[in-house]
From Swiss-Prot:
Phosphothreonine found at: 147
Taxonomic source organism: Homo sapiens (Human)
Residues carrying a glycan: 250, 260
Keywords, alphabetical: Cell membrane, Disease variant, Disulfide bond, Endoplasmic reticulum, Glycoprotein, Membrane, Metal-binding, Phosphoprotein, Receptor, Secreted, Signal, Transmembrane, Transmembrane helix
Subunit (UniProt): Binds laminin, and possibly also collagen type IV.
Protein name per its UniProtKB record: Anthrax toxin receptor 2
Reported tissue expression: Expressed in prostate, thymus, ovary, testis, pancreas, colon, heart, kidney, lung, liver, peripheral blood leukocytes, placenta, skeletal muscle, small intestine and spleen.
GO cellular component terms given for this protein: cell surface; endoplasmic reticulum membrane; endosome membrane; external side of plasma membrane; extracellular region; plasma membrane
Annotated binding of a divalent metal cation, by residue: 52, 54, 118
Disulfide bonds: 39-218
Keyword Transit peptide: no
Biological process annotations from GO: collagen fibril organization; single fertilization; uterus development
Keyword Signal belongs to the record: yes
Signal peptide: 1-33
Length: 489
């Protein structure tokens, strides 16, 4: 019985199932899972394994190969199936996504006893039956067939026939050959010779091709650009991921679009690279329309999708923005003309300035007080009267003395009296009063405010400078007449 795909679960419900492979791989499983590449794509994976008598001594290596390869596919929506073949084929694990059943299927696979012939077509037939029951073209399936010997008789033709049926159902077929296999036989069974993985070193070397199988089989779409477009606009879609070269060799890559979940169309991509793809997209004519994007690598038989949706939105055509910019530029030009018009195109004739006011009269300085000069008692010189008895004083100045004093001769006992000048005491300067106000506290915006104030003062000064040149009421203004006079001169 084939299990159907389980319904969607909450993110937390996958916590334990997502770790089942790490538990099976032992204590170092978590570290290896972080270091080794993995595949997050959701698809159905079928292992078709040779259990003929020639692999009896190497079955544990085949089991380890299956276990380690299954660890790399980490999508919670992935489903697995184990099929073994010899003279007949047997389903060890029907297709299921239940992690408990997968763990039990691995245990059953480990206990298989190899015996019989190598009828690989019988295993492919059971895989095709499960693909049809699981949904056929609605699912993305991968078949990995492993054998160790040459196919005899009609087995190669039967195997090729079953492989074609698998591809018609949308499945990709990969072959692993160990030791004594024939390369040409497996190339005809697989999709291409690049999808055949030879292991010449024996079963112990199987683990060396796990990364190669993963790189070839895991095709993922990780990013879509753009996610929104303008209504009525032509555009192209860029898909980013890995494994895009899978179907590009035979031209079977298609970009599939579903518009509003109503109709579907497919186109060939413009270019396909290993990790990117460029596809032309249909035009969306209404706002709110959605475009669901998916990719097919087998000519449309099966598709790969992952919530890749493009939405149409209303967009302005840019004319309104251009008009607004032009209007702003026009207003700016008018403002500049108004500012510089008085400087370049107007000559202002002003009335002559009034005569300057008379200079103020300088006040006469007060004469300095007369200096006290020494006086001489001329009585000792015999002047003023008979016998010089009458007292007479002679005052000396900067120009000499009086006429009487000029005719006198100094007596021996003449006395010169010099008035004593009293020195005024020096008054000490009163101390400077202490400032009564505190300096303003500096704010964080003080430097910015200072620079803005300086810029505003500069603009005001320039404006005042221009405004002084503007004509005032009563001024005579000449524009073209003055220009003509200058030209004629």
């Amino acid at each position: 019985m084939v299990a159907e795909r389980s319904p969607a679960r909450s993110p937390g419900s996958w916590l334990f199932p997502g770790l089942w492979l790490l538990v099976l791989s032992g204590p170092g499983g978590l570290l290896r899972a972080q270091e080794q590449p993995s595949c997050r794509r959701a698809f159905d994976l079928y292992f078709v394994l040779d259990k003929s008598g020639s692999v009896a001594n190497n079955w544990i290596e085949i089991y380890n190969f299956v276990q380690q390869l299954a660890e790399r596919f980490v999508s919670p929506e992935m489903r697995l199936s184990f099929i073994v073949f010899s003279s007949q084929a047997t389903i060890i694990l029907p297709l299921t996504g239940d992690r408990g059943k997968i763990s039990k299927g691995l245990e059953d696979l480990k206990r298989v006893s190899p015996v019989g012939e190598t009828y690989i077509h019988e295993g492919l037939k059971l895989a095709n039956e499960q693909i049809q029951k699981a949904g056929g073209l609605k699912t993305s399936s991968i078949i990995i067939a492993l054998t160790d010997g040459k196919l005899d008789g009609l087995v190669p033709s039967y195997a090729e026939k079953e492989a074609k049926i698998s591809r018609s159902l949308g499945a990709s077929v990969y072959c692993v050959g160990v030791l004594d296999f024939e390369q040409a036989q497996l190339e005809r069974i697989a999709d291409s010779k690049e999808q055949v993985f030879p292991v010449k070193g024996g079963f112990q070397a199987l683990k060396g091709i796990i990364n190669s199988i993963l790189a070839q089989s895991c095709t993922e779409i990780l990013e879509l650009q753009p996610s929104s477009v303008c209504v009525g606009e032509e555009f192209q879609i860029v898909l980013s991921g890995r494994g895009f070269m899978l179907g590009s060799r035979n031209g079977s890559v298609l970009c599939t679009y579903t518009v509003n979940e109503t109709y579907t169309t497919s186109v060939k991509p413009v270019s396909v690279q290993l990790n990117s793809m460029l596809c032309p997209a249909p035009i969306l004519n209404k706002a709110g329309e959605t475009l669901d994007v998916s990719v097919s690598f087998n000519g449309g038989k099966s598709v790969i999708s992952g919530s890749l949706i493009v939405t149409a939105t209303e967009c302005s055509n840019g004319i309104a923005a251009i008009i607004v910019i032009l209007v702003l530029l026009l207003l700016l030009g008018i403002g500049l003309m108004w500012w510089f018009w008085p400087l370049c195109c107007k000559v202002v004739i002003k009335d002559p300035p009034p005569p300057p006011a008379p200079a103020p009269k300088e006040e006469e300085e007060e004469p300095l007080p007369t200096k006290k000069w020494p006086t001489v008692d001329a009585s000792y010189y015999g002047g003023r009267g008979v016998g010089g008895i009458k007292r007479m004083e002679v005052r000396w100045g900067d120009k000499g003395s009086t006429e009487e004093g000029a005719r006198l001769e100094k007596a021996k006992n003449a006395v010169v009296k010099i008035p004593e000048e009293t020195e005024e005491p020096i008054r000490p300067r009163p101390p400077r009063p202490k400032p009564t106000h505190q300096p303003p506290q500096t704010k964080w915006y003080t430097p910015i405010k200072g620079r803005l104030d300086a810029l505003w003062a500069l603009l005001r000064r320039q404006y005042d400078r221009v405004s002084l040149m503007r004509p005032q009421e009563g001024d005579e203004v000449c524009i073209w007449e003055c220009i003509e006079k200058e030209l004629t001169a």
